[in-house]
Amino acid sequence: LTCHTCPYNTCANSETCPAGKNICYQKKWEEHRGERIERSCVANCPEFESSHTSLLCCTTANCD
């Protein structure tokens, strides 16, 4: 599985997920500098927190 890794809405960078991390995720939240995005490979989908504006977990290549 490969997942996007850059902190932008449009992302060309991907990484191959290590063994045991078979979920791509994308988390968005607002800061004083504007919207922040975090993307990576994870073993379990993180919980949605009240500070997040969106949370996406998926299992197909570059779906985040």
Swiss-Prot record:
Keywords: Acetylcholine receptor inhibiting toxin, Disulfide bond, Ion channel impairing toxin, Neurotoxin, Postsynaptic neurotoxin, Secreted, Toxin. It comes from the Eukaryota. It is found in: Secreted. One of its GO terms (molecular function) is toxin activity. Disulfide bonds join C3-C24, C6-C11, C17-C41, C45-C57, C58-C63. It holds the Pfam family Toxin_cobra-type. InterPro entries: Snake_3FTx (IPR003571), Snake_toxin-like_sf (IPR045860), Toxin_cobra-type (IPR054131). Expressed by the venom gland. Gene3D superfamilies: CD59 (2.10.60.10). GO terms for biological process: modulation of receptor activity in another organism. One of its GO terms (cellular component) is extracellular region. Belongs to the three-finger toxin family. Ancestral subfamily. Produces peripheral paralysis by blocking neuromuscular transmission at the postsynaptic site. Very weak inhibitor of the endogenous nicotinic acetylcholine receptors (nAChR) in the human rhabdomyosarcoma TE 671 cell line. This neurotoxin is lethal to zebrafish by injection at the back of the dorsolateral region, but is not toxic to mice by intraperitoneal injection. This is Long neurotoxin MS5. The lineage of its organism: Eukaryota, Metazoa, Chordata, Craniata, Vertebrata.
